[in-house]
Amino acid sequence: GVRAWASQKAVELICRHSPWFGLQGVDVDGLRRRRGWEGAEPHVVASSHLLNRVHRHSRLVSEGLLVIADDHHLREDSRTAYHRMRSRAVQGLSDGKLHHLLDTMYFGPSNQSRLLQAVDVLTYFEQRRRHVTERHRDAVRRMNAIGRSLNKIRQHSYVWTP
């Protein structure tokens, strides 16, 4: 229908701007079993790994990168981890200091930021194509088209299994 068409067009429009799109996860059960990591927040671990990956990419950008994230309940823990990672290498989380990323990590509600809304759209469809089996022929066709667009921009997709 019209919503599927509009969704496909929205993804194509976002992808036309060639954003760096990456997904990072963590095996929560494995994290809980790993000695020394039992109390680690999975969200903070995954976002730290992703920030490390973004930093590797940012070395190509001389003026540095601004990090904007969707507001969430662990924002202060994430901000603390971010500052720690900018000042020194953190074992298990970063290759070295994240000095190419600008000094502050900004959090905001996605309903007030077109950038965060764009990330939400891409993330929603990436998760949907991984976890939902489409049954309707037209939905399969639309999701395949959306998937092709996502494949062009997705540069990182990994689940860390401690």
Regions found by a protein language model. Name each.
Residues G1-P162:
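Phosphate-ester processing/binding pockets and catalytic centers
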